[in-house]
From Swiss-Prot:
Coiled coil: none
NCBIfam families listed in its UniProt record: recR (TIGR00615)
Official protein name in the record: Recombination protein RecR
HAMAP family, A to Z: RecR
Species annotation: Gluconobacter oxydans (strain 621H)
PANTHER family: RECOMBINATION PROTEIN RECR
Start and end residues of each Toprim domain: 80-175
PROSITE patterns noted in UniProt: RECR, TOPRIM
Length: 198
């Protein structure tokens, strides 16, 4: 790139991060390099600390510095309500929204024949173990509105049916502020199918 080994390696590593292309990576590298004391060194220290301290929660699959994670050990959480998500990023998004007061199960992906991901590749065992222990009333499937998300939701629903717990799925359809004429056919169909009375 620029003929400077260390700088090129920094840009290359930054460009591997989701959402950062080569141009954004160069800008980020420049911002870090221009202020090494106030930006780069603190960031490097935090990244090193996170790499050694952050672990995956053995109960739900969340990332935290403790295992079980803070959500799983929070006495104020409703353990009878489990929200199943694909990724830790999905869990964090729901936490930011502040609407779910139960616990979670992070699958780590979805079923995908194309990607070669089957049921054994998903983190579902802890979910079924918690259900077997008793006290779980409802499992909310908060999976993406994709073919893989729908396939995974259907597979989970079939496995959960014999347990007697209520299985629900998050609503899909028209987003807040969304105009109908700009939505794709699949979104409109999902919105009409998932309609509810007022």
């Amino acid at each position: 790139m620029m003929g400077h080994g260390d700088i090129d390696q920094l840009i290359t590593m930054l460009a591997r991060l989701p959402g950062l292309g080569p141009r954004s990576a160069r800008r980020a590298a420049l911002a870090l390099l221009r202020q090494p004391e106030s930006r780069m060194l603190p960031l490097a220290h935090l990244m090193e600390r996170a790499a050694t301290r952050v672990k995956t929660c053995s109960l739900c699959g969340n990332l935290d510095t403790v295992d079980p994670c803070h959500i799983c050990t929070d006495a104020g959480r409703d353990r009878g309500l489990i929200c199943v998500v694909e990724t830790v990023g999905d869990l964090w998004a729901l936490e930011r929204a502040g609407v779910h007061r139960g616990v979670y199960q992070v699958l780590g992906g979805t079923l995908s024949a194309l990607a070669g991901l089957g049921p054994d590749d998903l983190n579902v065992r802890p979910l079924f173990e918690r259900i077997e222990e008793g006290g779980v009333r409802e499992v909310i499937l908060a999976l993406s509105a994709t073919v893989e998300g729908a396939t995974t939701a259907h597979w989970l629903q079939e496995r959960l049916l014999p347990t007697g717990v209520t299985v629900t799925r998050v609503g899909h359809g028209v987003p807040m502020g969304g105009a109908l004429d700009v939505l794709d056919d699949g979104t409109l169909a999902a919105a009409l199918t998932a309609r509810r009375s007022l």
